[in-house]
C-alpha cells in the first residue's frame, strides 16, 4: 500500500452551510419525526446533533457529507440531510461519493492532522484547505477511496 500527502482542499470541498439557524431562534425537539431534520452544531456529542428542527427545507445540507465545526474541529459523517448552526462547514469528497466508511477513514486522518490546533480557534477555510493529510494512493495522484472503505469495513 502506497501513501501520499494531500492538501485537504485537493481532496475535499469545503462549503458553507445552505442556511445558518441560531439556537435561540428555532424550536429544537429532542426526537426525530417525519417533519423535522437533524440540527448539527459545534458540539462533540451525539454526532454533532443538538436536536431536530423543522425549517425551510431548501436550507438543508446534503446527506452523505461531513459536518465540520470551525471553532472546535469536531467532524461527523451526516447520513441524512441536516440543518446547521453557526460556524459549521459542509465537506464533500471531490470526484467521489462519500460513504460512511470513507468518511470514517477521512475523519480519523483529519483528527490526526488537526491534533496540534488549539480548541476555540476559528479555523478559516483557507487554513483548513491547506492542512496536509496522508492517504492511500490509487494512482500517482488519485486517493484510493475504495481501499479506505475496505480498511474501515474490514474487507
Give each language-model segment a name.
Residues 32, 59-60, 124-126:
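Intrinsically disordered, low-complexity regulatory regions enriched in Ser/Pro/Gly/Thr
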Residues 47-48, 75, 98, 114-117, ...:
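Short loop/beta submotifs within extracellular cysteine-rich repeat domains
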Residues 50-107:
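A short beta-sheet element
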Residues 71, 87, 106-138:
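Glycine-anchored helix-breaking recognition loops at helix->coil/strand junctions
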